[in-house]
Design a protein with these regions (language model features):
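Internal alpha-helical transmembrane segments
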Residues: 1-40
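Alpha-helical transmembrane segments of multi-pass membrane transporters/translocases
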Residues: 11, 15-18, 22, 292-300, ...
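Membrane-helix interface segments
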Residues: 14, 221-222, 309-314
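Short hydrophobic, aromatic-rich alpha-helical segments embedded in or entering the lipid bilayer
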Residues: 336-357
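Transmembrane helix boundary and interhelical loop/hinge segments in multi-pass membrane proteins
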Residues: 199-214, 218, 222
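Secretory targeting signals
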Residues: 26-82, 129-206, 227-306, 326, ...
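Central hydrophobic cores of alpha-helical transmembrane segments
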Residues: 20-23, 311-324, 340-343
Length: 396
């Protein structure tokens, strides 16, 4: 029965068009991603072609490894010399400043925990400051834990998380991962909308074609057939999401490379409480996107099962992931509520920057894991209600 239901789904012309559109958009997004990084060569010529990211990685390869205080001191000295000699468009930028851009950003991030990005900090650092760099990092971690921890339990939790950061930091150029995280987030929203549209049709099509009487009169129409429809929705979600993400990832990483997979995210956001490498960060983003698609599928199927039409159901994913963020910004007085909406699943990039935590009893949870658990449970919990909605209709 499952095979037959899947055949119905994937043979429907509008669904084939939607899936084809998803795959075409994956290719288009790949094109944007692989040409989004900027590389300046030794002659000062800037390029953004498909090989720009690999060239950028090669340009920064000399700095791969452990960033000791001595290494950081060399970076500061090189930065000061370069700034006095050239601007970004000059040839010196490509050979002097560009290779250390990531490391410069890391130093600034560590030294300005509560301030905006300020390059002037690099010109104010002394040799003594550099030799005490990681000590300063530790002290600032303690201040951050004290500032964002509202209770003693929260403060201890934040201190524990910060202590998980391995110092000195290991560096490798992470441009491809940083770029991909941005594009995979946007693409996951598109996949969630497409999944919601296709899954809504699973329960609405029988009513639209007036075949519901035949469906309910069959031997398994009251039980197994409905369960099969629900299972088909889950399988369809997995298939579409995996096809799209795998295609996007294979194209982009195949062209840009996977350099920086083990580089800690703290290279970019020094005081993030999400202690992870860029590879783990990408996986987190992909998993959150999958949960978003599963939630979209469950809600769309439930609405379609109750209303017997696809028109309202297809709007649900668009509302959850496109409109709700704007509503949240408009209703700034309800920040606590909007920090737990489904949009977080498709906006991981913004959430990992903020040390937002919640406490229930003596248990402390970070925002993203809490949201992941909440909406995974919700997506699964809605499935029995879909089944019951169809049973209620049949008993009329």
């Amino acid at each position: 029965m499952l095979k037959l239901e899947l055949k119905r789904i994937f043979s429907k012309k509008i669904n084939v068009f939607a899936i084809g559109l998803a795959l075409i958009l994956a290719v288009i997004f790949s094109g944007f991603a692989v040409t989004s990084n900027r590389y300046v060569d030794e002659n000062g010529n800037a390029s953004t072609g498909i090989m720009a990211t690999r060239k950028l990685t090669d340009n920064r390869r000399a700095w791969k490894g452990t960033l000791t205080e001595d290494e950081l001191g060399t970076v500061i000295e090189q930065n000061k010399n370069a700034v006095t000699q050239s601007s970004e468009e000059n040839a010196i930028y490509g050979t002097t400043l560009q290779p250390i851009d990531d490391i410069r950003g890391f130093i600034i991030s560590v030294l300005t925990p509560d301030a905006e990005y300020d390059e002037s900090v690099l010109n104010q650092i002394t040799e003594e400051n550099i030799q005490e760099f990681y000590d300063t990092y530790h002290k600032n971690m303690e201040k951050m834990a004290e500032e964002y921890g509202k209770t003693s339990v929260q403060k201890k939790y934040l201190e524990k998380k910060y202590n998980e950061i391995k110092l000195p930091v290991e560096y490798e150029s992470y441009s491809s991962w940083d770029t991909m995280i941005m594009y995979v987030e946007t693409y996951s929203i598109i996949l969630a909308i497409i999944v919601g549209f296709i899954c809504a049709g699973i329960f609405a099509d029988d009513f639209q074609t007036k075949a519901d009487a035949v469906f309910f009169s069959t031997k398994y129409g009251r039980t197994k057939a409905v369960k099969t429809k629900i299972l088909a929705g889950v399988v369809t979600t997995v298939m579409i999401y995996c096809m799209g993400i795998i295609l996007l990832s294979v194209i982009c990483f195949g062209i840009m490379g996977t350099s920086g997979m083990n580089t800690p995210y703290q290279m970019y956001q020094a005081y993030s409480i999400y202690i992870m490498s860029y590879g783990q960060y990408y996986l987190l983003t992909v998993v959150c996107g999958f949960i978003a698609s599963m939630l979209a599928a469950s809600v769309s199927m439930l609405v379609a099962a109750k209303m017997h039409t696809i028109s309202v159901a297809v709007c649900i994913p668009f509302f959850l992931y496109c409109l709700l963020p704007f509503i949240g910004r408009a209703l700034s007085g309800y920040t606590t509520l909007f920090n737990l909406i489904p949009t977080i699943l498709t906006n991981v990039q913004a959430s990992v920057k903020v040390p937002l935590i919640y406490q229930i009893g003596n248990c402390v949870f970070r925002q993203i894991p809490l949201v992941m658990v909440m909406y995974t449970v919700m997506a699964i919990a809605l499935l029995p209600f879909i089944y019951k909605s169809f049973r209620r209709y049949r008993n009329k």
